[in-house]
Design a protein with these regions (language model features):
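N-terminal Rossmann-like NAD(P)+-binding domain of SDR-like oxidoreductases, especially those catalyzing
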Residues: 1-73
Length: 73
């Protein structure tokens, strides 16, 4: 299973990413890093820097990744 975490570089999002990865889940993170920090993103997560309001950007991530579920922070 692959879960997309929107806002996965923020405090709550990054902790969620760590918990998911510890459970063996494949994680993809999108964050614009306005309030999040790249250092907070788990090294096993695939990270995309961008704004979720940019439909073309989000579509490109969804085209590239096989996402089963989304968590939005």
């Amino acid at each position: 299973m692959t879960i997309l975490v929107l806002g996965g570089a923020g405090y709550i999002g990054s902790h969620t990413v760590y918990a998911l990865i510890e459970k063996g889940v494949d994680v993809v993170v999108i964050d614009n890093l306005e309030t999040g920090h790249i250092e907070a993103v788990h090294e096993k997560a695939r990270f995309y820097k961008g704004d979720i309001r940019d439909r073309a950007f989000v579509d490109s991530v969804l085209d590239h990744e096989n996402i089963d579920s989304v968590v939005h922070f």
